[in-house]
């Protein structure tokens, strides 16, 4: 949690991965850097960004800007998920389920960073297939975006929450 930066406007920013990439041209190789970041308000809003530049700080800055631009709202239930959810992107598949208070974030690598900045405090999760950070982040955000609160389901069906709970 120490490498999460608090920003003005209460956004938490987290750097997930920096990678050196190269383009081979006639005269040799052109090196550049890519950065993967996630941004969240710790209260159900989260977004990720992927930036590329000749220098690391510029790549990180581009990634942060992109992350702020494409944030989504996540319907959380008192610091955990509403229901078990699955998400996938290319070769990565993730499964997450709600956990009781005091469990903590049981998640690895890139998935943990997304859940921390989104404001999830208790969750059980597992990543299957590819553990490429970009794909895991996309799969995690896909799963969080597919999660529906009882209020959302009730509104979609044109019923009250009590009718849905049975």
From Swiss-Prot:
CC terms in the record's Gene Ontology section: small ribosomal subunit
Domain S5 DRBM: 11-74
Gene3D superfamilies the record matches: 3.30.160.20, 3.30.230.10
Keyword Nuclease: no
A GO MF term: structural constituent of ribosome
Top-level taxon of the source organism: Bacteria
One of the GO biological process terms: translation
InterPro entries membership: Ribosomal_Su5_D2-typ_SF, Ribosomal_uS5, Ribosomal_uS5_bac-type, Ribosomal_uS5_C, Ribosomal_uS5_N, Ribosomal_uS5_N_CS, Ribsml_uS5_D2-typ_fold_subgr
Subunit text: Part of the 30S ribosomal subunit. Contacts proteins S4 and S8.
Family listed: Belongs to the universal ribosomal protein uS5 family.
Function in brief: With S4 and S12 plays an important role in translational accuracy.
Domain remark from Swiss-Prot or TrEMBL: The N-terminal domain interacts with the head of the 30S subunit; the C-terminal domain interacts with the body and contacts protein S4. The interaction surface between S4 and S5 is involved in control of translational fidelity.
UniProt-recorded name of the protein: Small ribosomal subunit protein uS5
Protein source organism: Haemophilus ducreyi (strain 35000HP / ATCC 700724)
Gene for this chain: rpsE
């Amino acid at each position: 949690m120490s490498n999460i930066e608090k920003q003005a406007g209460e956004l938490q920013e987290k750097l997930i991965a920096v990678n050196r990439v190269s383009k081979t041209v006639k005269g040799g190789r052109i090196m550049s850097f890519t950065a993967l970041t996630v941004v969240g308000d710790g209260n159900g809003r989260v977004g990720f960004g992927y930036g590329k530049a000749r220098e690391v700080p510029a790549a990180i800055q581009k990634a942060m800007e992109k992350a702020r631009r494409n944030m989504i709202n996540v319907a959380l239930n008192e610091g955990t998920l509403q229901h078990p959810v699955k998400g996938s992107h290319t070769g990565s598949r993730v499964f997450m389920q709600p956990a009781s208070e005091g469990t903590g974030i049981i998640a690895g690598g890139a998935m943990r960073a997304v859940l921390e900045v989104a404001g999830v405090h208790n969750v059980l999760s597992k990543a299957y297939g590819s553990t490429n950070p970009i794909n895991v982040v996309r799969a995690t955000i896909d799963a969080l975006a597919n999660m529906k609160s009882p209020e959302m389901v009730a509104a979609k069906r044109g019923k009250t929450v009590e009718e849905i709970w049975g």
